[in-house]
């Protein structure tokens, strides 16, 4: 019987989206638990040393924190057993691997500003959803008054973090322009391939899905924006959260990646 892992986090977490997508695509059994779970506060946080998510717990009590480390845990475990993951995250060829790493970095760092901007600067549309969502994850069984205080504290921290990351009145026009350009370019690419590098997701896709799912396709304001102006990207987000192969948009079955000498022009723009 396969091991069932415990994954602690929250749906709104950018890096939780990266890990969840990977586990689903690999058909790795797991139970998703919220950061407000008493066990997380009593056992996980002291062991890790701080309040941070996601954290994966194995059946023997081993804890792995950080999305990249969790993915590497499974990839390295398979390699040590002379096995291969169902859908290896790291391409075997040089150019494809370099492109995958580049987009992993872009997803985790380059997309951070639009993710934070479109979450925290549109309260009229987002705030009610965010408050309910954060409270459900961080304080699921407490009284409403205390839960709202928890949200207010978390919200203030995240808004300050957004500014620290470079989301300011001066930078917002450029952030919005660059994000719109990304949606346009990625939409064009997704008309010819279901994933970044071809027929299956790689570490580049897991980097992209982190901001695209948790913030930009899930929070009300940017979700509507994506559905209206970049439906191909929205369907990509849905594919990345499905454990099975999804043959929408005229794609045929197959999990091959582009060869190094046949990278599409849409990856070079």
Stretches with model-predicted labels:
Residues 113-269:
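GST-like fold's C-terminal all-alpha helical module
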Residues 1-145, 196, 216, 269:
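GST-like domain detector, emphasizing the conserved glutathione-binding G-site
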């Amino acid at each position: 019987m396969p091991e069932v892992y415990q994954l602690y986090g929250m749906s709104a977490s950018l890096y939780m989206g990266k890990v969840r997508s990977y586990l689903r695509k690999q058909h790795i059994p797991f139970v998703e638990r919220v950061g407000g779970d008493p066990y997380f506060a009593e056992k996980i946080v002291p062991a890790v040393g701080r309040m941070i998510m996601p954290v994966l717990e194995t059946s023997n009590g081993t804890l792995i924190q950080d999305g990249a480390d969790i993915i590497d845990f499974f990839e390295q475990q398979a390699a040590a057993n002379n096995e291969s993951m169902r859908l290896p995250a790291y391409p075997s060829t040089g150019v494809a691997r370099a492109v995958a790493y580049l987009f992993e970095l872009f997803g985790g760092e380059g997309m951070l500003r639009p993710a934070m901007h479109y979450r925290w600067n549109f309260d009229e549309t987002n705030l009610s959803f965010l408050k309910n969502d954060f409270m459900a994850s961080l304080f699921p069984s407490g009284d409403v008054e205390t839960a709202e205080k928890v949200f207010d504290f978390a919200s203030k921290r995240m808004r300050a973090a957004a500014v620290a990351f470079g989301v300011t009145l001066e930078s917002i026009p450029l952030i919005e322009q660059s994000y719109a350009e990304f949606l346009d370019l990625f939409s064009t690419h997704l008309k010819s391939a279901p994933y970044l590098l071809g027929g299956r997701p790689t570490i580049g896709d897991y980097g992209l899905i982190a901001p695209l799912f948790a913030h930009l396709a899930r929070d009300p304001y940017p979700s509507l924006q994506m559905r209206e102006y970049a439906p191909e990207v929205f369907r990509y987000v849905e594919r990345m959260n499905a454990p099975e192969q999804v043959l929408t948009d005229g794609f045929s079955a197959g999990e091959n990646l582009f060869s190094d000498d046949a990278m599409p022009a849409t990856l070079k723009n």
